[in-house]
């Protein structure tokens, strides 16, 4: 069975974009692959979050993963900082990484531009840590978006370089894995682009009915079509895309027909869309709240995941130490 690795930074609640873009596919993949899903709390340190925020956000993502259907008996769900072997491999990969290639990565240049007063070494060596996360479990496939493709190429480069330096065929080059039809691009509510964590753009799985309604009713619209069967502007198309994802085909076709007839009332459409989003989120929201209240369950799942992840990681590190020439641990 092939190994798949995917991580998420604990920077807030999961939203509909996270669910339909990745998490829903993870619930299917856990039956087909040897899956490692981790919460990347070490990666979050580049922005210096408060300790309380790290703990809270980590437990939030863990609870939401479980509520969405990721099964700790079928997949390994763990917190990155619980697997200290990752840091050891991170060190070894950094020893083989060159300053110039790290400085040229798009992720580093973008982050340096966004936070010029906090251009730290963690940002520079982000590709090395990401590679350690992946190579630690000898992953064959890694579900990533286009924005991470350069870092995936770096991971492959680090794997090749390690093999070349030590004259071994140890690390397999991991391949980017497109979720294809399993993943849907969910648009944001601000009229353009995909759903993200920016204010007013996202609907979170934990949002209650009132919050969902308020967000949807504020979504950008226009004065309505003036010609039958006219092309939908992006903000309007975004609403229809959301409706296509969460509503029944009959509901979607009803409002699409009204739009094409120049008879649509956006207020009615938004009310229906809000109701359908709430109907989808409600059972997940209830499970999230229940799981968040069960601290023992969260601790047990994290402990189980750490044990399974460290078992895999220990094998890799022991072999890496032997290849490099270090004494056994």
Report each predicted region and the residues it spans.
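Conserved nucleotide- and phosphate/pyrophosphate-binding catalytic cores
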Residues: 150, 156-329
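Short helix-capping/linker segments at secondary-structure and domain boundaries
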Residues: 99-103, 136-143, 247-255, 285
């Amino acid at each position: 069975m092939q190994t798949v690795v995917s991580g998420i930074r604990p920077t807030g609640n999961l939203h509909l974009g996270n669910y339909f873009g990745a998490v829903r596919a993870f619930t299917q993949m856990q039956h087909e692959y040897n899956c490692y899903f981790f919460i990347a709390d070490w990666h979050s340190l580049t922005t210096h979050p408060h300790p309380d925020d790290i703990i809270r956000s980590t437990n939030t993502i863990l609870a939401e993963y479980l509520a969405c259907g990721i099964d700790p008996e079928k997949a390994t769900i763990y917190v990155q900082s619980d697997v200290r072997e990752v840091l050891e491999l991170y060190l070894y990969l950094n020893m083989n990484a060159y300053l110039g290639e790290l400085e040229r990565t798009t992720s580093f240049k973008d982050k340096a531009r966004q936070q010029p007063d906090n251009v730290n070494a963690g940002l520079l060596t982000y590709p090395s840590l990401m590679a350690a996360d992946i190579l630690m479990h000898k992953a064959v496939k890694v579900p990533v978006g286009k924005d991470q493709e350069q870092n995936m190429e770096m991971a492959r480069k680090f794997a090749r370089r390690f093999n070349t330096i030590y004259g071994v065929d140890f690390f397999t080059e991991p391949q980017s894995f497109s979720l294809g039809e399993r993943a849907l691009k969910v648009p944001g509510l601000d009229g353009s682009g995909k759903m993200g964590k920016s204010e007013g753009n996202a609907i979170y799985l934990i949002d209650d009915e009132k919050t969902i309604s308020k967000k949807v009713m504020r979504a950008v619209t226009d004065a309505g079509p003036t010609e039958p069967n006219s092309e939908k502007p992006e903000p309007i198309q975004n609403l229809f895309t959301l409706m296509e994802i969460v509503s029944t085909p009959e509901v979607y076709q009803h409002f699409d027909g009204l739009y094409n007839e120049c008879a649509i009332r956006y207020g009615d459409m938004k009310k229906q869309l809000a109701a359908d989003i709430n109907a989808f989120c409600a059972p997940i929201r209830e499970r999230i709240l229940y799981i968040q209240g069960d601290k023992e369950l969260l601790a047990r799942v994290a402990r189980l995941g750490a044990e399974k992840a460290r078992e895999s990681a220990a094998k890799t590190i022991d072999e890496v130490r032997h290849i490099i020439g270090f004494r056994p641990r």
